[in-house]
Amino acid sequence: MLKLILKNLWARRRRNVWLLAELILVSIVTWIILDPVIVTTYDRSIPLGYDTDRLCLVTLSTLQSQAPGYDEEAEDSAMIMKSYFNLTRLVKDYPGVESATPVLGFAYPNSTGNANTSIRAEGDTLDLPVMIMEFIPHTNFFETYGFRSGRGRTPAELSDYDYTENDIVMTENTAEHLFHTKNAGNKRCWSREGNDTIYSPVIGVVGNFKATSDSRPAPVIFRPLISIDMEDAYDDMRILLRLKENVSMKRFLHDFQPWMVKELRAGNLFARNVRSYEALITKN
């Protein structure tokens, strides 16, 4: 029986070779097409890691020197910062807003910009590539974004901590890569800047989150902005706000936008647009 089967296969070897080639070709094409789709679908199904349902982002801009109302004295870095904080306070005091925080820089969750570096655990020589996001201390940054608590300090405590220049906050996956534990508080990282060795104490840990909606959570560190030159930050000033529970996003945006255009001005700064974070994610 076996000899008969082998004889038949050999007699039809040319046809069988073509069938095998077709099967291989179909398998390759299917893998090329379906594998990225499956991976992307899986990545999109992973939770963002922060609460976007009640978030809005206000983008700021600045008057040009020839524009009516331009104030040359308001171009000082300290005056720009004062105006920025005044606008943030106005947003925070608007009816229906639970909290608001300045978002300064081009790298923030689901932004189109990114910043990267490499760090090492103290006593180790293995580099870990990480994304960098910056924040201004004492501005309710972590709890406004709705990051999940990690081991140690709560998001509110991390927002209100008295940071020094080299302190950092990291995500849980960063801590696990570097220290093989999610509890990285009071540990240190190090990096080199030229001939200098920079040690960075880990102040706390937040839950993993997706830097973009179609990616997996990557290692991220947060750096506090201690000394800020606002004259170089005109294109990167935003205000993140979180609505109170049960406030309609659609109704809020309908009422907030005309008020924003009329009232949200300070120095040479003004609000250019506002959108829900869900809309930002959809666009990006």
Predicted regions and their residues:
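Short, strongly hydrophobic transmembrane alpha-helices
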Residues: 12-41, 50
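Solvent-exposed, non-transmembrane alpha-helical starts
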Residues: 67-82, 128-132, 162-166, 179, ...
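"Rare, low-scoring activations can occur
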Residues: 172-173, 196-284
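The feature marks short, hydrophobic/small-residue-biased sequence motifs that occur predominantly
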Residues: 113-151
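A short amphipathic helical element positioned immediately N-terminal to and/or at the very start
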Residues: 1-10, 87
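Membrane-proximal extracellular/periplasmic loop immediately following the first transmembrane helix
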Residues: 36-122
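Beta-strand-rich non-transmembrane domains
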Residues: 96, 127-136, 151-169, 188-208, ...
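Short, solvent-exposed hinge/capping segments at secondary-structure junctions
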Residues: 139-153, 165, 169-186
